[in-house]
C-alpha cells in the first residue's frame, strides 16, 4: 500500500491508477490535479496540473492505445483533457457544454474509440467523441431533471467468435441522479443518440454513484449507492431480461455512501462513505453478498 500524505492543500476527491498501475492521478478541492509515479511502496510527484476554476471532482485515464491522456471534471462546469508527451503535461482540449458542476467523467471501453461520458448537475449527460482531426462531436441527453451525479459505461460485449463488439449499437451506460433513480441508456442508430432503455427504482434519496461491473458475462451487474445509506446490486440475466434488485445488506450503512468501484475482474465491490471506511464485498455461491474485508491505511 502506498500512503501519499500532504499531496493537496484541501480535500482529495479522487485517486486513480493508470492502466499499468505505474502512475497515480489525484484531484482536490484545491483546484489542482497531481500526477505521481508509483514504484512498489514509494511515490514521486511528477507534475501538478492547473486549469480548473473550482474543486476537481474526478479524473480518469484513457486507454494507453490513445496515448498518455487524462480527463478531469470540476465544479466549474468543464472537462479538461490533458496529455503527456516527452515528459511534459499540457492541456489539449476543453469540453464546456454544461451549465453547472460536472460530477463524473469516464472514458469508454477502448473498443469504442476515444469516447468520454460526462455527467452534470444541469441534468444532462454528454458523450463526447474525439476525432483524429482534433474536433469533438458531443451528444447531449436530458437524463435526470434535477441533476446527474454519476455515469458509468457498460463493458464492450463479446461476440460469438470471442471478439469484442465495438459497434455503436452495443454502447450502453448507466446514470444515477438526484431524482433517486438509476437509468440505463443505449445507443440508437436511427435516432443517432442514446435512448432510455430502463428506469430502476429502489433508492429513497439521491443516487451518489453508479458502477457497471467490467465482467463480460451473460449476466450484467450494476451497483448503485445513495444518500439513503444503502447499496443496491442490480442484475440482468440477458439483454432482453428484466433488472433484478438485491440490497447488498438488509440494514443501512452507518453513513451516506459516496462511491462504488468494482475490481478489474468484476468479482469484488469496494464501497466508501461518510464514515471514512472502504469496505469490500463479494457474492457467495448462494447469490448473497458478504463482507470481504476493509481497507485500512
Swiss-Prot record:
It comes from the Eukaryota. The keyword Endoplasmic reticulum applies. One of its GO terms (molecular function) is structural molecule activity. PROSITE patterns: WD_REPEATS_2 (PS50082), WD_REPEATS_REGION (PS50294). GO terms for cellular component: cell periphery; COPII vesicle coat; endoplasmic reticulum; endoplasmic reticulum membrane; nuclear envelope; nuclear pore; nuclear pore outer ring; Seh1-associated complex. The basic repeat unit of a COPII coated vesicle is composed of 5 proteins: the small GTPase SAR1, the heterodimeric SEC23-SEC24 complex, and the heterotetrameric SEC13-SEC31 complex. This repeat unit polymerizes to induce membrane deformation into a transport vesicle. Component of the nuclear pore complex (NPC). NPC constitutes the exclusive means of nucleocytoplasmic transport. Functions as a component of the nuclear pore complex (NPC) and the COPII coat. It is one of 5 proteins constituting the COPII coat, which is involved in anterograde (ER to Golgi) double-membrane transport vesicle formation. First the small GTPase SAR1, activated by and binding to the integral ER membrane protein SEC12, exchanges GDP for GTP and recruits the heterodimer SEC23/24, which in turn recruits the heterotetramer SEC13-SEC31. The polymerization of COPII coat complexes then causes physically the deformation (budding) of the membrane, leading to the creation of a transport vesicle. This is Protein transport protein SEC13. It comes from Saccharomyces cerevisiae (strain ATCC 204508 / S288c) (Baker's yeast). The gene is SEC13.
